[in-house]
A protein has these predicted regions:
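Cytoplasmic helix-loop-helix junction between adjacent transmembrane helices
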Residues: 102-137
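C-terminal membrane-cytosol helix-exit motif in multi-pass small-molecule transporters
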Residues: 150-151, 165-185
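C-terminal transmembrane helical hairpin of 12-TM major facilitator-type secondary transporters
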Residues: 263-316
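A late C-terminal transmembrane helix in Major Facilitator Superfamily
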Residues: 329-348
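Helix-loop boundary and gating motifs at the non-cytosolic
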Residues: 2-51, 200-207, 212-224, 228, ...
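Structural signature of the two symmetry-related core transmembrane helices
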Residues: 72-86, 165, 264-279
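Intracellular juxtamembrane helix-capping segments at the cytosolic ends
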Residues: 110-123, 312-326
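Helix-to-loop junctions at the C-terminal end of transmembrane segments
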Residues: 57-70, 154, 249-261
Length: 348
């Protein structure tokens, strides 16, 4: 376990920068869309571009990694993500932003697949849940930090977009300078969706439904909070709580999944998430009624924290569960397949 973590520090640091930029960007675009008076339909359309790209990228990434390797793919798509965010500040239009979000989605799914296949290659069935949970802690913790950067400058200025680009570019440094060798699969075996389903029907179906949930939460949370008249600081707090509570949950739930049937842990977490998501909606509607607004917001925060605690660790559990049933030379294809199904659920 310690050896795996020591050999993966560059990947963890690089992904930390990537996710910090992603968290900042997600909130920034949602709030900027409201300030530009995009309609709710236009905003939803624009933000959905990310998952269209996610869906497209997942279908092609195994072949790209097989041809040029993990490090080059990480570097290339990090550079693309860094470039794309700058164009948002120049061309403020829902359709243009949709196309840019498609490119961002392609970039991110390629980066995720590189990172997750790298970690799966380094870990074993005995510690895979714990390793992936630490990875997810870093991801969601970084997202939380990035979301607080929304207070850096007004979303109407160009400076926040430049900062997102700078942070994304910084992710290249540890990856390109590491002495640790990336995975060296002699051959990355293809894996059709049918093969993936045969290997892990539970993992594939779970990935689809997880995509439907997380796409709505991460793309529209800032928009929803803005519509409830939350201040920029309050929006930062809500999005930060989403990420940090999910980060805190990763390791204990991942550790539990290494000790017990991962499927039961996923099912239990799903029920918890459903209950507290419903409570969050009920409490948020109370804010529009006469009464103690501060109490309503506090209850909203608490129920939302527990929802995040239950829901955000699920993808690492799904990935670990699926990889328990396949050989190492199929990790890249299986990871990309799960990302593909996740993207399909996200745009459905």
């Amino acid at each position: 376990m310690n050896k795996v973590l020591k050999n993966s520090w560059a990947l963890f640091l690089g992904m930390g920068f990537i996710m910090m930029a992603y968290g900042f960007q997600s909130s920034l675009l949602g709030v900027r869309a409201v300030e530009e008076e995009f309609s709710l339909t236009s905003t939803g359309f624009m933000m959905s571009g990310y998952f269209v790209g996610y869906f497209m990228g997942a279908a092609t990434i195994p072949g790209i990694i097989s041809k040029v390797g993990h490090i080059r793919v990480f570097a290339a798509f990090s550079s693309l993500a860094s470039l794309v965010i700058l164009v948002h500040s120049v061309l403020v239009n829902p359709f243009v932003w949709f196309l840019l979000r498609v490119l961002t989605g392609i970039s991110m799914v390629c980066i995720y697949t590189v990172a997750e296949s790298w970690l799966n290659d380094r870990s074993s069935n005995k510690n895979r849940g714990s390793v992936l949970s630490i990875y997810m802690v870093i991801l969601y913790g970084s997202v939380g930090i990035g979301m607080f950067l929304l207070n850096f400058s007004s979303p109407k200025n160009f400076q926040p977009f430049i900062l997102v680009s700078v942070i994304t570019s910084a992710a290249l440094l540890p990856i390109l300078l590491t002495k640790q060798k990336p995975p060296t699969f002699k051959k990355i075996k293809a894996m059709s969706l049918r093969n993936l389903y045969e290997a892990s029907p539970f993992g594939m179906v779970s990935s689809f439904f997880y995509g439907t949930i997380q796409s709505a939460v991460f793309t529209l949370l800032a928009v929803y909070a803005t519509s409830m008249n939350f201040t920029i600081l309050e929006i930062s707090i809500v999005t930060f709580l989403l990420a940090i509570s999910g980060a805190i949950a990763q390791f204990p739930i991942g550790k539990i999944s290494d000790l017990y049937d991962r499927r039961k842990v996923i099912i239990f977490s799903t029920f918890g998430a459903a209950i507290f998501a419903t409570l969050s909606i009920i409490v948020s509607r109370q804010m529009y009624l006469p009464g103690d607004l501060a109490t309503s917001k506090t209850l909203f925060y608490i129920s939302f924290i527990i929802f995040s605690f239950c829901s955000l660790p699920m993808f690492s559990l799904i990935l670990a569960h699926t990889n328990d049933y396949i050989s190492k030379d199929k990790f890249v294809a299986a990871g990309a397949g799960l990302q593909f199904v996740f993207g399909l659920g996200a745009i459905s």
